[in-house]
């Protein structure tokens, strides 16, 4: 997605060898017009696949997921990273390791929001090592629902997340694919959408 790549080049900041900071439009402050375009692109790609739910993980996946769900006219569910007192029964959980935060969290979704009839599109902000998507897949499959595809806003192609997910049989479609960081600049691979 050319618009996204241009925004990454303009406002993204490289930290160290493998972290891209995009807090001015995705991971802290949200550019809703860009998120709306992201949602439209994902929705156009998956419009004929029978998607019934969009699922993401809090927090930075929520914005692109909600705009995708809006464009598809289906509900969006986000997995919570912390259990609260209102989630006391009927909870589907999985362990997820965060590459950026370097911690493992138990993420959860109330089972009443997913059913065996659901065809789910996972949307997330980043794909690095694939652990967030893997955790969401586990939760979705615990409910008996089907993962149709995984939509990623920014993929770190130099990490093994895509390979892990595709080898397990899940299609991955990314709007921006980072090949590497070179001389303080992002180098892109050809994106899927």
Swiss-Prot record:
Broad class of where this protein is predominantly found: cytoplasm
Reaction(s) the record says it catalyses: XMP + diphosphate = xanthine + 5-phospho-alpha-D-ribose 1-diphosphate
A GO CC annotation given for this chain: cytoplasm
Identification of the protein by name: Xanthine phosphoribosyltransferase
Single Gene Ontology MF annotation: xanthine phosphoribosyltransferase activity
Keyword Cytoplasm assigned: yes
Key words of the record: Cytoplasm, Glycosyltransferase, Purine salvage, Transferase
Species the sequence originates in: Streptococcus pneumoniae serotype 4 (strain ATCC BAA-334 / TIGR4)
Binding residue positions for xanthine: 20, 27, 156
Intrachain S-S bonds: none
Binding site for 5-phospho-alpha-D-ribose 1-diphosphate: 128-132
CDD domains: PRTases_typeI (cd06223)
Top-rank EC class of the record's enzyme: transferase
Similarity remark: Belongs to the purine/pyrimidine phosphoribosyltransferase family. Xpt subfamily.
Function comment: Converts the preformed base xanthine, a product of nucleic acid breakdown, to xanthosine 5'-monophosphate (XMP), so it can be reused for RNA or DNA synthesis.
Cytoplasm among keywords: yes
Assembly with partners or alone: Homodimer.
UniProt cross-references to NCBIfam families, sorted A to Z: PRK09219.1 (NF006671), XPRTase (TIGR01744)
Pathway per the UniProt entry: Purine metabolism; XMP biosynthesis via salvage pathway; XMP from xanthine: step 1/1
Gene3D superfamilies assigned to the protein according to its UniProt record, in alphabetical order: 3.40.50.2020
EC number: 2.4.2.22
Subcellular location(s) per record: Cytoplasm
GO biological process: purine ribonucleoside salvage; xanthine metabolic process; XMP salvage
């Amino acid at each position: 997605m050319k618009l996204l790549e241009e925004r990454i080049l303009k406002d993204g900041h490289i930290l160290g060898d493998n972290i891209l900071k995009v807090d001015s439009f995705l991971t802290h402050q949200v550019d809703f017009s860009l998120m709306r375009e992201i949602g439209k692109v994902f929705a156009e790609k998956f419009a004929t696949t029978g998607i019934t739910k969009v699922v993401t993980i809090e927090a930075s996946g929520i914005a692109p997921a909600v705009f995708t769900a809006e464009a598809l006219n289906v509900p969006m569910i986000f997995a919570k990273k912390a259990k609260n007192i209102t989630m006391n029964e009927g909870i589907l959980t999985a362990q997820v390791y965060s590459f950026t935060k370097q911690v493992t969290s138990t993420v959860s979704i109330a089972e009443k929001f997913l059913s065996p009839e659901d065809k789910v599109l996972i949307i997330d902000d980043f794909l690095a090592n694939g652990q967030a998507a893997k955790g969401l897949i586990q939760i979705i499959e615990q409910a008996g629902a089907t993962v149709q595809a995984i939509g990623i806003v920014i993929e770190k192609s130099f990490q093994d997340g895509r390979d892990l997910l595709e080898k397990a049989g899940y299609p991955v479609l990314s709007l921006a694919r980072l090949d590497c960081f070179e001389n303080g600049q992002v180098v892109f691979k050809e994106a899927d959408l």
